[in-house]
Amino acid sequence: MTFNDVIGNKNVKQHLLELMLQNRLPHALLFLGKEGSGALPLALAFAQLIICQPKSSPVVEDLFGGMSAISNEPSFLHPNDIESSTSYSKANLLVHPDLHFSFPFINKKNSDSSTISADYITEWREFLMQSPYGNLYDWLQVIKAENRQGNISAKECLEIIKKLSLKSFESDYKVLLMWLPELLSKEGNKLLKLIEEPPPNTIFIFVAENEEKILPTILSRCQLIKIPLPENDEVEEALLKKANIEPEQAKQIAAISNGN
């Protein structure tokens, strides 16, 4: 997933790039956008950029006995400089070991409370690949939830704490992308200390639709990134590029889509 794959929101993309390239990246961000805004694919594209940065230069002893980096390269590189890398290919396939996901799910068995997001990782990867603009209903259909409601459980929160306490594998950074933190309920309070005092180079990216349903204690610890719905002309342009339809038809569809 790249920024170019996400419809519209040029200003948001530019803001995110500036945060990264100017080394002003906060440790917790909340991407807030209505269904159809592209908040999830945009967050995913941004997460990929973070974990695919080249490893920091090693430090060596200088002439005065201090430790200095071999290179004074900037901490973050522009997307154009990393999109051909092996790590970017892994991230694009959603298999990079330092990119972690958390999302609503149902227990594998009705009486089993040990289920975690990782138990659905294969389905989740397929969902993101095939339906990056999908909604909660679409996802619950994929995992055959039937009439059961998905949530993010206490067990899942403990698993997040465990995963993020480990060192990164290939990147300088670890990123947790959590979709729909509205479904954390009070269990999310287990994450507060980790969000407030994360291990070095650990980034939380929350993707939400309804600000009012997010725990205030989590909301207050995040930098808010509002994702508006794409404009009609942006939807029209995307349809012409990706759907291979006539210009007039693209214009009509964009007009009635209301950005969705």
Feature names for model-found ranges:
Residues I50, P54, I195-P198, A243:
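Active-site catalytic pocket residues across diverse enzymes, especially alpha/beta-hydrolases
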Residues W179-P181, F206-E211:
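A short beta-strand-to-loop transition that corresponds to the Sensor-1 phosphate-sensing loop
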Residues S165, N189-I205:
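Conserved catalytic/switch belt of AAA+ P-loop NTPases
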Residues T2-K186:
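Clamp-loader machinery-focused feature within the broader ASCE/P-loop NTPase space
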Residues L40-P41, T202, T217:
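Phosphate-binding Walker
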Residues L224-N260:
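Long, charge-dense, solvent-exposed interaction surfaces that engage phosphate-rich ligands
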